[in-house]
UniProtKB/Swiss-Prot annotation:
Organism of this sequence: Clostridium acetobutylicum (strain ATCC 824 / DSM 792 / JCM 1419 / IAM 19013 / LMG 5710 / NBRC 13948 / NRRL B-527 / VKM B-1787 / 2291 / W)
UniProt cross-references to Gene3D superfamilies, sorted A to Z: 3.30.590.20
EC number assigned by the record: 6.3.2.2
UniProt-recorded name of the protein: Glutamate--cysteine ligase
One Pfam family here: Glu_cys_ligase
Amino acid sequence: MHWSFPEMIRLFSDEYRSSMLSEGNFGVERESQRVNYSGDLALTPHPSVFGDKFENPRITTDFSESQIEMITPPLKSAEEVYKALNDINNEVKNALKGELLWPLSMPPRLPKEEDIPVAQFPDTEDGRQKQIYRNGLALRYGKKMQMISGIHYNFSFSDKMIDFIYRQLRIEKTKRQFIDEMYFSLTRNFLRYHWILIYLFGASPICDSTYNSVIFKELEKIEKCCPHCAGKIKNFNRYATSLRVSRFGYSDTDEKKYTVYFNSLREYETKIKKMMETESNKYSKLGIYKDGVQIQLNGNLLQSESEFYAPIRFKRNIKKGETQLTALVNRGVEYIEIRILDVNPFDKVGISVEQMNFLQVFNVFCLFEESKSIDEEQMERINTNHQLAALLGRNEDLMLYKYNDDSRIPLKNFGDEIFEKLRIVAKLMDKDNVEKKYSESVESEYKKLHNIELLPSERICREMDNDNRSYIQFGMEYAEA
């Protein structure tokens, strides 16, 4: 949008207006594998006590039959979301018999590839589509990669705040056009600066040896296409913050030809549709049917829009007969889904209230900051900074790329620039807040920028080293807590 950070700060400068910045709808989806008391992936069916996967809006499965997904409804505050997620988490824990919820994003001890159970669905048209889609994911990427779990954080600003900006800035567009452009503007800045969330909240610096085959395969690919990169990336076992969001976790390298730049809804729709309609030599060679059974939906770059992996996605509640993409095109962006958060093992529900408060400050900052279009060159730097923060974030000498020129900047210095504005936003949001919870969340996270010891990724490695514990032993201690 065509506004500046100082202009937006002035616009929300009084207490009544600033209170709107913390209002909206918020929700969390948490994925977690079920494990037995030895730390092995549970191979049992999804517990029947949770009912039909299609019918239960709070507890379902993700890729695997062993992978539970807990979903809160949209609520009005971080505190309400936390309570709702805690209630669901307790319900699941109490229902599990001889099993626990794995507290980490990277998988527990995995069986052989063929023994990992894909989620099972009823023999209905919708059920068959979901089943074939998941079988296709297993065929394309391997089941082990699909066993990674995370936190999806959903949010939207309040109608009151959106109306206020629309009126005050006298936007010469329809309300719907303005809302779409507002969320796309925020998203472009989120992409530019989300590396700092990977650094601060990354909690998957290590994995079990049963996942190593995925890492070795990716390292081989890197050595072939980028030999000079391989040496640096091999240091991931010393410096990683989040294997989950790195090349060793979810990756969209096969989709690069149709990179989505998030510059408009039309471009977003066109690029994703193109990937859904363009045949992939790699995937089509795998076949669509095997022994008379359909093994993937199609041989295209994307089987469906759900396969589009991105740090952030646009969402709309769908009506009968709609897909997520057609709902967006028909009625516009309703809310945003942040997808780069690792499960926090140091909080019983996988994400803390403080994290959610910080995310709200960060999202407002991304909204306020000027947001020009992203081009191919800038997207390349965005993706590079993402990978550097994920694989080498704990290297105190790490340099990131700036976006306005070809220069590089120390991670800490780049972070200081961001936190300078986050403090201003948090102070504004705390004007009518006695607790000063937004400023406190910013100061708490700022300490991590200059003290690696405070990072969750570093804490995981330190606790494992100090107590000479394996990855599985560490995970089981927090699973049983």
